[in-house]
Regions:
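Bacterial N-terminal signal peptides
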Residues: 7-15
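Positively charged n-region of N-terminal signal peptides that target proteins for export
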Residues: 1-4
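Mature extracytoplasmic/periplasmic regions of secreted or cell-envelope proteins
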Residues: 20-173
C-alpha cells in the first residue's frame, strides 16, 4: 500500500513537469538557467562575480536579477526567430524537405513545434552566455597573473576584484 501511494504521488508530481516541458521557457526560467550555467562554469568565482548580501548568501539571486533583462531578450528574440522560420516559404527547401513541424517536432499531438523551437533557441543563448562567462574568467585570471598592479588599478585589490573583471568582460550580462 505504501508503495502504491508513493508511486501515485510521484506520478502526480511528474505530470506538471512533463506538461511544462512542452512550453517555451519563461524569462525567469531562462535567467535561472543562465545563472546555473554561470555557477557551473565560474565555480568559486561565481560569488565574487555577482556579489552577495550581508550574510554572504545571495549570489544566485543577484545573478538572476542581473540576467532578467537578458533572459527576456533571449526569449523574445527566440520567439521572433522561430516565427520567422515558421512563416518562411522556403523553410522546407533549406531544411532537407522537412516542414517546420517536422524539424522541431512537437508534443504527442504534434502541435508544439513553436515551443520546441523557442526552447532550443533559448538553450543556445544560455550556452553562449555560459561560454562567455567562462572565457571572461580565463581572461581575467590571465590579466591578474600577468600584471597584478594594473589589474588592481582597473578592478580594485579586494576579494571581489576578479568578479568585477568577469562582469565587465562578460559579453552578455
Amino acid at each position: 500500500m505504501k508503495k502504491v501511494m508513493l508511486l501515485l504521488s510521484l506520478v502526480a508530481l511528474a505530470a506538471p513537469v512533463a506538461a511544462f516541458a512542452d512550453a517555451p521557457p519563461s524569462p525567469a526560467q531562462t535567467a535561472n538557467a543562465m545563472c546555473a550555467a554561470a555557477k557551473t562554469s565560474l565555480g568559486t568565482a561565481f560569488a565574487t562575480t555577482y556579489g552577495t548580501n550581508a550574510s554572504k548568501s545571495n549570489a544566485f539571486g543577484k545573478c538572476v536579477s542581473s540576467h532578467a533583462k537578458a533572459a527576456q531578450n533571449a526569449v523574445n528574440n527566440a520567439s521572433k526567430s522561430c516565427k520567422a522560420q515558421q512563416a518562411d516559404a522556403n523553410f522546407a527547401t533549406t531544411h532537407g524537405g522537412q516542414s517546420f513541424a517536422q524539424v522541431y517536432g512537437g508534443s504527442k499531438n504534434g502541435k508544439n513545434a513553436m515551443g520546441k523551437c523557442v526552447s532550443q533557441a533559448v538553450q543556445s543563448a544560455v550556452a553562449a552566455q555560459a561560454k562567455a562567462s567562462k572565457s571572461a574568467l580565463k581572461s581575467c585570471k590571465a590579466a591578474m597573473k600577468a600584471d597584478k598592479a594594473a589589474f588592481a588599478t582597473t578592478y580594485g585589490a579586494g576579494k571581489d576584484a576578479l568578479g568585477k573583471c568577469v562582469s565587465a568582460k562578460s559579453a552578455t550580462k
